[in-house]
Amino acid sequence: MSERKFFGTDGIRGKVGSGQMTPELALKLGWAAGRVLSRSGTNKVIIGKDTRISGYMFESALEAGLSAAGLNVMLMGPMPTPAVAYLTRTFRAEAGVVISASHNPYYDNGIKFFSNDGSKLDDNLELEIEAELEKPLECVESHLLGKVSRIEDARGRYIEYCKGNFPADQTLTGLKIVVDCAHGATYHIAPAVFRELGAEVIAIGDKPNGVNINDKVGATSMAKICETVLTEGADLGIALDGDGDRIMMVNSRGEVIDGDQILYILACDAKARGVLRGGVVGTLMSNLGLDLALQALDIPFARSKVGDRYVMELLKELDWRIGGENSGHILNLDHGTTGDGIVAGILVLAAMRRQNATLEQLTAPMEMLPQVLVNVRFEGEHDPLSSDKVKAAQAQVESQLGARGRVLLRKSGTEPLIRVMVEGDDHNTVLAHANLIADAVKSAS
């Protein structure tokens, strides 16, 4: 496959106004995508965005480019990424476009595409779009220009879809839940979903102003929701990221429940109901505790590369249904085509109701092993991971850890960093092992 120039593993992303994320590129990208997508004969594309102030600019540019290529555009306004995937399917659109940089700060933004079935756009189509980007923009004839309309009931449609994933004979009455929307795309969705299911909801991170998305709130900044759960005496907390495709949770003790623990809950619940197909897909960063806990239940576990795109690829290859990342991207292919933080939260709450159990009780059998991650910066073309010294240090640590530990060394995909991850039974021992390997990497750099 040819090397992609613009598209990364999750679309195009960067700092607004520099590099790739300019209105000029967005205009041309809309046109190029329109040229490729119109070949199928369908001429309808949906656009959604998160709450970044730059979203207005990129929405207008994409809209103009798609229209210039002859495609009709349907605007959703601020809506979660999984809502775009869902409504792309239900409106029988040729594609969905999301303007978001997910959990990044407000000054970043990104553009990613979904195919007509609500899954990430095929690599080959992205390459075709990149090829069109190299050509001069040519507008279709005036009578063929695309029209633009707005989906006025997008919010209500998606709320009903989310609620449909909760058992019809159950309610959340009696539960007090803190919901953190990260000042992002779920601010007008998530609190309503859980309230309509019967819960008492305390919403935080629900007042976006264009520049506060993910700012000390949301799934990547858990301190505020942990504190709020404790001060409000809530039963649990649900934290979403800026575009709503990621979830972290908090139990009544103010302890964070991460993506690995959520996967464990969902797998146990599916097995108990006899609907678990195959096993669970995690990533190279998934805690060894998840692997061991699933082994104890005879549930197969497989690891993909880091990234929800790779989790999805392995799920499809194995024909399994449940997978995700410890960072909170949760995939359940019986309930959607992409990571959906709200739906994942609903599925956990459904498991709690079915088993009449708390979050603490559902996660108790899974022992999270201490995990230490050390980032080591390197310069030049030399690969420190090929060093005999680094290999020797890794072998020494793996020998000492045995079956109750794990070492992972990998290069960052975005920075000149080697990530050293070590897991084991004792935090201090794991920290010492990680520093030993990190020192070897530094000396080899």
From Swiss-Prot:
Catalytic residues, chain numbering: 102
Domain of life: Bacteria
Binding note for cofactor: Binds 1 Mg(2+) ion per subunit.
Substrates-to-products reaction catalysed: alpha-D-glucosamine 1-phosphate = D-glucosamine 6-phosphate
Gene designation per UniProt: glmM1
Function: Catalyzes the conversion of glucosamine-6-phosphate to glucosamine-1-phosphate.
Designated name of the protein: Phosphoglucosamine mutase 1
Cofactor entry: Mg(2+)
Origin organism lineage: Bacteria, Pseudomonadati, Pseudomonadota, Gammaproteobacteria, Alteromonadales
BP GO annotations: carbohydrate metabolic process; peptidoglycan biosynthetic process; UDP-N-acetylglucosamine biosynthetic process
InterPro entries: A-D-PHexomutase_a/b/a-I (IPR005844), A-D-PHexomutase_a/b/a-I/II/III (IPR016055), A-D-PHexomutase_a/b/a-II (IPR005845), A-D-PHexomutase_a/b/a-III (IPR005846), A-D-PHexomutase_C (IPR005843), A-D-PHexomutase_C_sf (IPR036900), A-D-PHexomutase_CS (IPR016066), Alpha-D-phosphohexomutase_SF (IPR005841)
Gene Ontology CC terms: cytosol
The family this protein is said to belong to: Belongs to the phosphohexose mutase family.
Keywords assigned: Isomerase, Magnesium, Metal-binding, Phosphoprotein
Source species of the chain: Shewanella sp. (strain MR-7)
A Pfam family annotated for this UniProt entry: PGM_PMM_I
Molecular-function GO term, any one: magnesium ion binding
Residues modified to Phosphoserine: 102
